[in-house]
């Protein structure tokens, strides 16, 4: 194969059979359980990279069920998103996500810079409540519950919240182990069709784990819980800050 052929075909690895396809990446009936809680503000400031700014000591703990996604298939994801501001613009910084499917792990890390790791999350209705769990290996590290559809939420408001900017710290090492890419990336959910939004009483339990340290941001108080179902497109990203260029 000639170098020009490599350049023209290069998208992802392996070259002859990429781990994920080119987009757009559309999700149908994507289901969220988002439990917002108050945590230690000092710990937040220690882990959120500038120029992002922590405005409130809050964390969104998310369980996401994606049964129909373009190119990625059927999978579930769980992790923590921290409310932040960038140049006065409110958004969410994804700290870490744990999921059970290789293509979105590879694509998420290589394209956008999603901090994804392999684990075993679940999200389903358990009799009278919706239940989210996260197991890392044989250890249960997160359990979230919410009363099932106790009260409807405003569809337009929840659509607007989901459409806000999201931020990622994309890191790709050079072959010698030094940083080759170290960028703050912004992306948006696009073409959102909110099909339902509800709230109810909720609980969240986090357990310590050396390699899935969700409990490092302790739950001090449950602030809000939301159960959402939507169709949406995961938009590609843009670099807003290059740490290596500073």
Swiss-Prot record:
NCBIfam families: PRK02265.1 (NF002614)
Keywords: Decarboxylase, Lyase, Schiff base
Pfam families: ADC
Function (record text): Catalyzes the conversion of acetoacetate to acetone and carbon dioxide.
Name of the featured protein: Acetoacetate decarboxylase
Enzyme Commission no: 4.1.1.4
Keyword match Lyase: yes
Gene: adc
GO MF assignments: acetoacetate decarboxylase activity
Entry-linked HAMAP family: ADC
Lineage: superkingdom: Bacteria
Active site (record annotation): 116 (schiff-base intermediate with acetoacetate)
Catalyses which reaction(s): acetoacetate + H(+) = acetone + CO2
Signal peptide residue numbers: none
Family of this protein: Belongs to the ADC family.
Species of the source: Burkholderia cenocepacia (strain HI2424)
């Amino acid at each position: 194969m000639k170098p020009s052929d490599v350049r023209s075909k290069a998208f992802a690895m392996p070259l002859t059979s990429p781990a994920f396809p080119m987009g757009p990446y559309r999700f149908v009936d994507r289901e969220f359980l988002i439990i917002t809680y108050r945590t230690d503000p000092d710990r937040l400031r220690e882990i959120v990279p500038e120029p992002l700014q922590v405005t409130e000591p809050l964390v969104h703990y998310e369980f996401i069920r994606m049964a129909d996604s373009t190119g990625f298939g059927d999978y579930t994801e769980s992790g923590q998103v921290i409310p932040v501001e960038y140049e006065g613009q409110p958004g969410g910084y994804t700290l870490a996500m744990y999921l059970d499917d290789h293509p979105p792990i590879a694509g998420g890390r290589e394209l956008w810079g999603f901090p994804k790791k392999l684990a075993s999350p679940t999200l389903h209705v358990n009799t009278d409540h919706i239940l989210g769990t996260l197991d890392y290996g044989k250890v249960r590290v997160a359990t979230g519950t919410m009363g099932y559809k106790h009260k409807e939420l405003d569809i337009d408001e929840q659509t607007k919240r989901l459409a806000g900017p999201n931020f990622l710290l994309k890191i790709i090492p050079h072959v010698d182990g030094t940083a080759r890419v170290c960028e703050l990336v912004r992306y948006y959910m696009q073409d959102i069709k909110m099909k339902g939004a509800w709230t109810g009483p909720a609980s969240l339990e986090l357990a310590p784990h050396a390699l899935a340290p969700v409990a490092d941001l302790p739950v001090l108080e449950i602030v809000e819980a939301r159960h959402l179902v939507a169709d949406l497109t995961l938009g590609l990203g843009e670099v807003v800050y290059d740490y290596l260029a500073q």
